[in-house]
A protein has these predicted regions:
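PP2C/PPM-type serine/threonine phosphatase catalytic domain
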Residues: 2-269
């Protein structure tokens, strides 16, 4: 089904499948990751879907509080603000909305940390899917991938090693075992100033978007991810969840020590 927007451009009315699994892992006592999926039906725009994934800082106190704070803020935005915002221009202002939302979360968590005398923080990777488009907001080293024929990383890690690789000072092989491989150069709640990456793009029927914490991806190859998560292999939310649990179990057998979280969103017409 198609809809023509005010600018005369054809927009696709899509439906979405989504599923997410989060696991404490084999060594940690608490799960500091957080994830949510929200899908809403609208009369004018078809389904609108949002997925948000956060990884609370494992080395910081109360990381689960930081991740939960950001997840809750995005859910409130989706349920309370998005409905009246889309009654006008579809994408007008949504990017600025998400940037303000992330910065507000950063301020709130920073202030809480000051009051309690602790440091806490979280990554955030969020995607909004609507009418053949996606919007992504990203801070940290959780990731968003697009799976459509290949596995394409859409986000850039805000980490020390990623920055050094980009500058040509380090190889990817060196980064894998570098003592500062887990150091982030910005995260929500532990950085004085946070500047989220905001990304836009078009979606097609059959596109799959994967959000994951670093604990999920460290022990898996892109070939393994593609084989399980390509569109033809995930025909329902139940199958999605089964395959997510299968890969998480594989990661755990490979001695991953972190919390492990993965979410999938599939575009359908």
């Amino acid at each position: 089904m198609w809809l023509v927007n005010h600018g005369g451009e054809r927009e696709i009315i899509m439906k979405y499948l989504g599923a997410a699994v989060s696991d404490t892992g084999i060594s940690k006592r608490t799960n500091q990751d957080g994830v949510c999926i929200k899908i809403a039906d609208t009369e004018q725009h078809g389904q609108i879907a949002m997925c948000v994934l956060c990884d609370g800082m494992g080395g910081l106190k109360k990381g689960e509080l930081a991740s939960a704070t950001v997840i809750r803020a995005f859910i409130e935005w989706f349920e309370q603000q998005l409905p009246w915002k889309i009654s006008g221009g579809i994408w007008d202002g949504l990017s600025a909305d998400w940037e303000r939302l992330v910065k507000a979360c950063n301020f709130r968590i920073l202030e809480y940390g000051k009051q309690e005398g602790i440091t806490l923080g979280t990554t955030v990777s969020a995607i909004l899917l609507m009418e053949g488009h996606y919007l992504i907001a990203h801070v940290g080293d959780s990731r968003v991938y697009k799976i459509a024929g290949t596995v394409e990383q859409l986000t850039e890690d805000h980490s020390f090693v990623a920055r050094e690789i980009k500058r040509g000072n380090m190889t990817e092989e060196e980064a894998e075992n570098h003592p500062q491989r887990n150091v982030l150069i910005q995260c929500v709640g532990a950085s004085g100033i946070v500047t989220p990456d905001i990304l836009h793009g078009r979606t097609e029927k059959g596109d799959v978007y994967m959000l994951c914490s670093d604990g999920f991806r460290h022990k898996l190859s892109t070939e393994e991810i593609y084989e399980e998560f390509r569109a033809e292999n995930i025909g329902s939310a139940e199958i999605m969840e089964d395959k997510e649990r299968y890969l998480i179990s594989r990661v755990k057998t490979r001695n991953e020590r972190d919390n492990i979280t993965v979410a999938l969103m599939k575009c359908e017409e």
